[in-house]
């Protein structure tokens, strides 16, 4: 009933498996390709950077954003409480926090975003965000290292 059939393939199928140069390969290898960092900035451009969790697992005790806001070039800084609406995102189930949260909330992994800082230059934003280890006070929790521990703690 079902027999293999050789169907004629349209011309684009002939390129499958063929070695073809990228359309901008010549520009890349000669150093002439334009990159985002090479483009001039618009007047008034602001730069954002994330302040990241200094702990892999812990409970936030406080976040001192006033210190971050006082850094040179910083326009403002925001934490989870400043997000209007839900602080969750996710491809299917919206259960991943955008920012870690506030006092009493759990830090889930090292480098989890805790706050966002906006500044007049990229360097100023990054310098202020790097203060996370000093401005995010958190109490460390025991690590959860095995699937059995995660199941017992209902951490899925």
How would you name each of these model-derived features?
Residues 1-156:
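Flexible, low-hydrophobicity surface segments
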């Amino acid at each position: 009933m079902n027999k293999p059939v050789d169907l004629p393939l349209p011309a684009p199928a002939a390129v499958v498996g063929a070695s073809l140069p990228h359309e901008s390969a010549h520009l890349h290898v000669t150093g002439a390709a334009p990159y985002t960092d090479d483009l001039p900035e618009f007047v008034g451009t602001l730069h954002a950077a994330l302040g990241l969790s200094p702990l892999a697992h812990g409970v936030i005790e406080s976040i001192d954003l006033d210190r971050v806001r006082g850094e040179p070039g910083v326009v403002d800084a925001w934490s989870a409480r400043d997000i209007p609406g839900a602080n969750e995102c996710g491809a299917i189930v919206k259960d991943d926090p955008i920012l870690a949260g506030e006092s009493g909330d759990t830090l889930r992994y090292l480098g989890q975003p805790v706050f966002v800082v906006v500044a007049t230059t990229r360097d100023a934003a990054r310098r202020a965000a790097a203060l996370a280890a000093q401005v995010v006070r958190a109490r460390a929790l025991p690590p959860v290292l095995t699937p059995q521990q995660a199941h017992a703690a209902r951490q899925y």
